Amino acid sequence: MPSSLEKLSTNRVKLTIEMPFDELKPSLDKAYKDIANQVNVPGFRKGKVPAPVIDQRFGRGVVLQEAINDALPAAYGKAIEENTVVPLGQPEIEVTKLEDGEVVEFTAEVDVRPDFDLPDVSAISVEVPAVEVPDEDVDERVETLRQRFATNTEVERAAAKDDLVTIDLAGTRDGEVLEDATASGVTYKVGSEGMLEGLDEAVTGLKAGESAEFHSTLVGGPLRGQDADIKVTVTKVCEQELPAVDDDFAQLVSQFDTVDEMRADLRTALENMARLDQAADARDKVLEEVISKIDIELPTNLIDSELEARRQQVNQQLAQAGMTVEEYLEDSEEEVDNADDFWAEIEKRSLDALKAQIVLDKMADDDEIGVEQNELTELLFRKAQQNGTSPEEEAQHMMQHNHLPDWMQEIRRGKALASMVGAATVTDSKGNALELDRIQPDGTIADKQAEEDAPAEDSAEKADGKATEESKAEEKAPAKKATTKKISAKKSAGAKATTKKVVDAKSDDKPAAKKPAPKKKTAAKDDKSK
């Protein structure tokens, strides 16, 4: 099947593909069969209508059109391989010649991956913070366990700091009840400052059955940011008694006999988490360093479509949270404070993510990185765990939305990134060289002998660290305040290291750089005392 390539611009080409009619015959036969199964013609059983009759009654053009549509994807894919280009979007296809019985010619204009060389990754060095766990972090974990196993006793006195109260909240404005600012049976710790401003002062000194009123700004739901008059009624006051931190406590909340053992285990868990963050930071920095050494010109169409998709995704997340951009920025960790700068930052992160995908895809191609069945299975189970679904449901979703190519691409990118980081020199702030390929998904470090005995393909998964987290902007309750995380660019697992601030929405969108078809042990036990 002859084909030629014309370069229209740096990142766009036009393929001209000539398809002899004998190569179209299988699609023609299929078209006749499909049409025969769909139409009713007097004198013929369904599915048994001869080709000449179909031509006579419905026209040869109908058959040719269906046959060409069926044959185009394979012809286009073959031309892509023959001309060694990597498409970055859907092609614009036009049939330019159709000589019945002779030849079909069509053109396909498509954006392609920029031509660039990868730098020598072995020459790249990055430094990340050393893994350190302050005593204060361990103390905080111990305090969390004390809170979990505290004894709450109902009392008949007035509420005081650190008491647990059960309250009803009713919001009004100009005497009108605000349903979205009303809640019953809410448990609240006095002095925690975790809900409405003024609530702590209002409930302090109230006994069960007593009420107080105050004015505040709502911090969640559709009325977020609006002022309202709030009436709070205390229905129950409980005194909270925290257990002493002794060996009995350690035996109650953990698998250990002493407090020292429990604290050591908590510290280890925190170190593992910090190690995963350290590995992610290393991947970020290595990938950013690689990208900084490459001049990549992204296709305009690709940029426009990605930015529009990202803007829609962010707006959807904000709508689900009942927030405007301005309201989001008030409580978020974003480094910008106005909408224009926010969208500019979103654009920058999106473009960085696209560049990361393109770089990792090229490395995967250059290194001929493949995908094993066990890697697909691991990804399936990981996604099911992340999304709170069963492996069967996740597999069904994948098949329904044709996500298999996306999953394979995600795995290849992850392995390419692992290879890239493994080739670079990574040290911590104390000058220690890091062996990121020995870090397990739970943050532990693999035994060297076990690592040598493990299958080679496992190393990519270990180096990739934590699985991709798909977070969604959650709708805030009318009377509860929370810190909002950053919103960032959507990326695949392989490209996640370009930024750490990721809020991903589960999407059926195909990745921008996909080849398209045409058109251990833990200190805390389960709390069973509740």
Curated annotation (Swiss-Prot):
Keyword vocabulary terms for this entry: Cell cycle, Cell division, Chaperone, Cytoplasm, Isomerase, Rotamase
- Where is each PPIase FKBP-type domain found? 162-243
Give GO terms: molecular function aspect only. Answer: peptidyl-prolyl cis-trans isomerase activity; protein folding chaperone; ribosome binding
Supply the EC number(s): 5.2.1.8
User: Positions of the region Disordered?
Assistant: 432-530
Biased composition, class Basic and acidic residues, residue ranges: 459-478, 501-512
Q: What is this protein called?
A: Trigger factor
Natural source organism = Cutibacterium acnes (strain DSM 16379 / KPA171202) (Propionibacterium acnes)
